[in-house]
From Swiss-Prot:
<dbReference type="InterPro" id="IPR006075">
    <property type="entry name" value="Asn/Gln-tRNA_Trfase_suB/E_cat"/>
</dbReference>
<comment type="function">
    <text>Allows the formation of correctly charged Asn-tRNA(Asn) or Gln-tRNA(Gln) through the transamidation of misacylated Asp-tRNA(Asn) or Glu-tRNA(Gln) in organisms which lack either or both of asparaginyl-tRNA or glutaminyl-tRNA synthetases. The reaction takes place in the presence of glutamine and ATP through an activated phospho-Asp-tRNA(Asn) or phospho-Glu-tRNA(Gln).</text>
</comment>
<dbReference type="InterPro" id="IPR017958">
    <property type="entry name" value="Gln-tRNA_amidoTrfase_suB_CS"/>
</dbReference>
<dbReference type="Pfam" id="PF02637">
    <property type="entry name" value="GatB_Yqey"/>
</dbReference>
<dbReference type="InterPro" id="IPR004413">
    <property type="entry name" value="GatB"/>
</dbReference>
<keyword id="KW-0547">Nucleotide-binding</keyword>
<dbReference type="InterPro" id="IPR018027">
    <property type="entry name" value="Asn/Gln_amidotransferase"/>
</dbReference>
<comment type="similarity">
    <text>Belongs to the GatB/GatE family. GatB subfamily.</text>
</comment>
<dbReference type="GO" id="GO:0005524">
    <property type="term" value="F:ATP binding"/>
</dbReference>
<dbReference type="InterPro" id="IPR017959">
    <property type="entry name" value="Asn/Gln-tRNA_amidoTrfase_suB/E"/>
</dbReference>
<dbReference type="GO" id="GO:0050567">
    <property type="term" value="F:glutaminyl-tRNA synthase (glutamine-hydrolyzing) activity"/>
</dbReference>
<keyword id="KW-0436">Ligase</keyword>
<dbReference type="Pfam" id="PF02934">
    <property type="entry name" value="GatB_N"/>
</dbReference>
<keyword id="KW-0648">Protein biosynthesis</keyword>
<dbReference type="GO" id="GO:0070681">
    <property type="term" value="P:glutaminyl-tRNAGln biosynthesis via transamidation"/>
</dbReference>
<keyword id="KW-0067">ATP-binding</keyword>
<dbReference type="GO" id="GO:0050566">
    <property type="term" value="F:asparaginyl-tRNA synthase (glutamine-hydrolyzing) activity"/>
</dbReference>
């Protein structure tokens, strides 16, 4: 039987506010346990929550960016459940009247097509604390620093049909919230976490299958692996005569499998009711208009502009616009270096390789956009060749200065003197007289392969400094003269 996969995602994004959603406590990551928890966060009797307006503003920014309906009147509700890191015994969230309603996000698939993914809603809520198991023998510690950190939970429609589509959607959300500046997107620190709802159904069937939720997956790679593992588990289970049970599962990356955590709760299990300590939030049109006018250029618009303004391919434009920092870096390089396609190649390939090797982001790059742009100018004015440019780039990355100073100090300036190149080529051909005779006796097809040998010898003799274009032109004339 052929199966169709149905995937919906819930993405929890920690909003980049300076203080928590209902208290004045700081939200700094990595502080000593329980040093950033106020009486409100601890759930002490007699204290009242006060809503952080910045969290509301950030949620509205996101809603406008995905062309969603903004709830002009939205209500906070208590989500009741027991867990050791939830001191109040309930979580303040939103249920019937969320701040962000239906919207959509377009994602680019591997074959270049665009698919629209529906967003059901996005609502504000407070994060829970954190259970600490590693540092305690036979017991669990509780760190409430995270309790009360503002979250925007983004709930998609079940519109994805493969793990790769799901990853593309998460990457699009990740890029968007970073562009907006509402979340740092640091998945390793838990700033963006994903719950994956997965089900299968016979191909052509309209009714959804029984879904399982995989909780708290925190990397793009693990999202793909967890979903694929769960898909295979469900297929094997059904084809062996079993039934999928609706439940919450965890992904074990070491075993590459999901395992049962608990039966899946429904909304009525949490006994939601409006929080009596918080008034309904009324959002005025003027507040939204101020936010709308301040929205930055978003990834889809930037991709479109990169293609039309710089003549980039759809692939290159999507890669460069995948983060706001990378897009800004690229445009600064173009502003100085002038050639957009050359800049795109260096940013994506050479700089990208360096960043991967060092394990850092582009905002920590050891080569600034100004330095790279300056080096590209030297390629364009034939001061250095593309090959020598790699040596210059490595030196800049090692902190040896800008391109001009490195070229001067290392004597890397390209040889463009026709007389000097001509003399050098005569010496190369004299040293390879036998190959010259073979070249001249060969047919056109063999000559093409042999010509590369002479070019290589010439560049070796000049230590890579000879202008490649001049070498090719003069060499061809000498060999065929």
């Amino acid at each position: 039987m052929q199966w169709e996969v149905v995937i919906g995602l819930e993405i929890h994004t920690q909003l980049a506010t300076q203080s928590k959603i209902f208290s004045g406590s700081a939200t700094t990551f990595g502080s000593e346990p329980n040093t950033q928890a106020s009486l409100v966060d601890l759930g002490m009797p007699g204290v009242l929550p006060v809503l952080n307006q910045e969290a509301v503003r950030m949620a509205c920014m996101f809603g406008l960016a995905i062309d969603a309906q903004i709830g002009k009147r939205n209500v906070f509700a208590r989500k009741n459940y027991f867990y050791p890191d939830l001191p109040k015994g309930y979580q303040i969230s939103q249920m019937d009247l969320p701040i962000v309603g239906k919207g959509h996000l377009d994602i680019a698939l591997e074959d270049g097509t665009i698919k629209r993914i529906g967003v059901t809603r996005a609502h504000l809520e407070e994060d829970a604390g954190k259970s600490l198991h590693e540092d305690f023998s036979g017991s669990t510690g509780i760190d409430l620093n995270r309790a009360g950190t503002p979250l925007l939970e983004i709930v998609s429609e079940p519109d994805m049909r493969s793990a790769k589509e799901a990853v593309a959607y998460v990457k699009a959300i990740h890029a968007l919230v970073r562009y907006l500046g509402i979340c740092d997107g640091n998945m390793a620190e838990g700033s963006l976490r994903c719950d994956c709802n997965v089900s299968i159904r016979p191909k052509g069937q309209a009714e959804f299958g029984t879904r399982c939720e995989i909780k708290n997956v925190n990397s793009f790679r693990f999202i793909e692996r967890a979903i694929n593992s769960e898909i295979q588990r469900q297929i094997d289970l059904i084809e062996d005569g079993g039934k999928v049970v609706q439940e919450t599962r965890l992904y074990d990356p070491n075993k590459d499998e999901t395992r049962s955590m608990r039966s899946k709760e429904e909304a009525n299990d949490y006994r939601y009711f409006p929080d009596p300590d918080l008034l309904p939030v009324v959002i005025e049109d003027s507040f939204l208009e101020t936010i709308r006018t301040g929205l930055p250029e978003l990834p889809p618009q930037k991709v479109e502009r990169f293609q039309s303004q710089y003549g980039l391919s759809a692939y290159d434009a999507n890669v460069l616009a995948s983060s706001r920092e990378q897009a800004d870096y690229f445009e600064q390089v173009v502003k100085i270096g002038g050639d957009a396609k050359l800049a795109a190649n260096w940013v994506m390939v050479e700089l990208g390789s360096l960043l991967n090797k060092l394990g850092i982001e582009i905002d920590q790059a050891p080569v600034s956009a100004e330095q790279l742009g300056g080096m590209l100018l030297r390629i364009r004015d034939n001061t250095i060749s593309g090959k020598i440019a790699k040596t210059v780039f490595e030196a800049m990355a090692a902190g040896e200065g800008d391109a001009d100073s490195i070229i001067e100090s290392k004597g890397l300036k390209q040889v463009t003197d026709t007389g000097a190149i001509d003399k050098m080529l005569d010496e190369v051909l004299a040293a390879n007289a036998e190959q010259v005779e073979q070249y001249r006796a060969a047919d056109e097809a063999k000559r093409g392969k042999m010509f590369g040998f002479f070019v290589g010898q010439a560049m070796k003799a000049s230590k890579g400094k000879a202008n490649p274009g001049q070498v090719n032109q003069l060499l061809k004339a000498k060999l065929e003269g």
